[in-house]
Amino acid sequence: TFTWAHRISNRAVDFLQQPARAEEPFLMVVSYDEPHHPFTCPVEYLEKYADFYYELGEKAQDDLANKPEHHRLWAQAMPSPVGDDGLYHHPLYFACNDFVDDQIGRVINALTPEQRENTWVIYTSDHGEMMGAHKLISKGAAMYDDITRIPLIIRSPQGERRQVDTPVSHIDLLPTM
């Protein structure tokens, strides 16, 4: 199956293999459309998650009674697939995330040893996903951790490893580098 992620990764790998990349500094932003509609990924990834359910715990029981009205309207407009068991089943979403993870690996593995020595690799996202928490799906005008707590993984050329637990913003990236 050929997807947008394949194309983006192929172009990124081709870019890294150009002779100029060995001699000149560069910035490369690799941005994938998955896991958004139409949730296109190879069938083997979909099969892997066909029976996968994400347990929401207490977040599945929120009736939104004490929440702003727009949350209730959002829940009505986009009904959550989460049942009384509190399990979220969306194999396409999880399959696309796994597929994109493999595509990111392809791009990182295409870096030459010399490029790895002086390249920052930053992995992040623009938003999270409600996945049925609080009876909501997708993203929207809410400040739940499900939407705002997104990954930010930075590998600096120096390879310094540490974890930062304080809130940060994308605006902090450039000063960090």
Please identify what each model-predicted range represents.
Residues T1-I8, F15-H170:
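Active-site-proximal cap/lid insertion segments
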Residues L173:
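Catalytic core of tubulin tyrosine ligase-like
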